[in-house]
């Protein structure tokens, strides 16, 4: 009887001591000023810290919460809200920016547009060739067992037929459904009409509307760290780390090809074009664009990030407001790698010998198919059966490769989107620099000046 009594007294005494301490602290009158001081310090730190560092902090917190408290499903809501907000505003931003840019466009944009379109298509083809070579050097097989249900395009004609259909679809529905092919087409048409018929005041209203939408986008981007926190938490809590062991070789080949394209192939092409060290631009685009695209897994959601980066680097608004959304549609380096590697993995698994001419034809088909993947539900993965048909592989077997793609999609799709979307900004900036006679090193001055202005 004595022990419980003593324990009870000790517990009560501890509670009383804690209560007295709290009351004494509150009565001292120092609580509010100290709390206010802490809050001001946190706000000052938040404002002075770069967005990239904030995102990295969000990533770390997301990983920790995902591993330790996976049952906190409400955290994932932060990511869904962030991506949803970006996806909701991005089509509107593209529509008003493109229409306004075309309406105000002067001379000198033609050369840059030709340059950036060449980069988009050429690098996508080279990425497919890199994937072919890597698949020959490091052949990977996958276990093909059960058939997978799903629908995929029957061929290139189906892909481009859908693209044309989407292009001339209802413009309001195109904005509502984030159909960027339709948004681009109708925005260009409206912009041309404004250029020839509208007065200066009307065009200025469109420009003001673009500024308003851009302001809303910037507000959304300020919440990127919380959004990334939610996205990382969702991936870690749902998928864990098992995807690095199952299908590890296939995933390593895919990621390796994409990293090689991003860090070696694209910089080499830019170096030959600019005759200068390309890596100052490459690193900026990877840091400012690829990181966010990796976690949002949506090129469309990353359009505002790319436009914000181009604006900070003094790229002409008339140029980037069209080239960035266009790149979201046809710049598909990562998609070309995915389609090529997965198709050749199926061939290796079935013992199908792929000749060099067939491999080159596959590269071309994957390039054309990848450029249309933004118009296909499921993206690059559902274009795998189309490429497999080149080797006489039936749809049931090819769809099993699609299923494998969805299993490793947490990483594959993230890296693919990062490569695709950061390339949009990269080639836009390169084309603009070349037209102005500047070099990649010049962007360091712009960013350093921006940092001084923030301070």
Q: What positions do the PLM features span?
A:
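Short amphipathic alpha-helical coupling elements at transmembrane boundaries
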Residues: 76, 80-84, 111, 173, ...
């Amino acid at each position: 009887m004595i022990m419980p009594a003593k324990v009870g007294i000790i517990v009560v005494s501890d509670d009383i001591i804690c209560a007295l301490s709290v009351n004494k602290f509150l009565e001292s009158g120092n609580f509010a000023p100290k709390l206010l001081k802490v809050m001001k310090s946190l706000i000052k730190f938040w404002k002075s810290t770069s967005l990239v560092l904030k995102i990295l902090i969000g990533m770390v917190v997301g990983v920790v919460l995902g591993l330790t408290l996976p049952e906190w499903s409400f955290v994932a809501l932060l990511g869904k809200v962030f991506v949803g907000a970006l996806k909701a505003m991005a089509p509107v931003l593209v529509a008003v920016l493109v229409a306004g840019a075309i309406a105000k466009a002067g001379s000198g944009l033609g050369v840059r547009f030709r340059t950036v379109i060449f980069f988009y298509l050429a690098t996508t083809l080279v990425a497919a060739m890199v994937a072919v070579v890597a698949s020959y050097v490091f052949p990977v097989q996958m276990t093909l067992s059960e058939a997978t249900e799903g629908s995929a395009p029957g061929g290139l004609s189906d892909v481009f037929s859908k693209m044309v259909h989407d292009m001339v679809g209802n413009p309001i529905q195109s904005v509502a459904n984030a159909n960027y092919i339709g948004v681009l087409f109708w925005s260009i048409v409206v912009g041309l009409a404004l250029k020839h018929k509208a007065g200066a005041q009307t065009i200025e209203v469109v420009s003001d509307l673009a500024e308003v939408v851009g302001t809303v986008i910037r507000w959304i981007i300020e919440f990127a760290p919380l959004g990334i926190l939610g996205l990382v938490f969702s991936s870690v809590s749902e998928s864990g780390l098992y995807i690095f062991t199952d299908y590890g070789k296939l995933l390593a080949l895919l990621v390796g090809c994409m990293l090689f394209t991003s860090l070696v192939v694209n910089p080499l092409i830019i170096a030959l074009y600019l005759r200068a060290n390309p890596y100052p631009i490459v690193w900026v685009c990877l840091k400012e664009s690829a990181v966010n695209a990796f976690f949002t897994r949506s090129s469309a959601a990353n359009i505002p990030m790319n436009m914000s980066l181009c604006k900070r680097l003094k790229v002409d608004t008339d140029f980037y407001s069209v080239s960035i959304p266009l790149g979201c549609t046809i710049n598909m380096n990562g998609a070309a790698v995915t389609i090529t590697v997965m198709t050749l993995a199926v061939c290796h698994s079935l013992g199908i010998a792929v000749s060099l001419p067939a491999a080159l034809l596959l590269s071309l088909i994957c390039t054309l198919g990848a450029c249309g993947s933004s118009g296909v539900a499921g993206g690059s993965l559902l274009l795998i059966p189309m490429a497999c048909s080149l080797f006489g592989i039936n749809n049931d077997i090819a769809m099993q490769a699609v299923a494998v793609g969805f299993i490793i999609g947490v990483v594959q799709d993230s890296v693919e989107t990062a490569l695709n979307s950061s390339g949009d900004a990269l080639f836009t900036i390169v084309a603009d620099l070349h037209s102005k006679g500047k070099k990649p090193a010049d962007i360091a001055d712009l960013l350093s000046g921006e940092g001084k202005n923030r301070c």
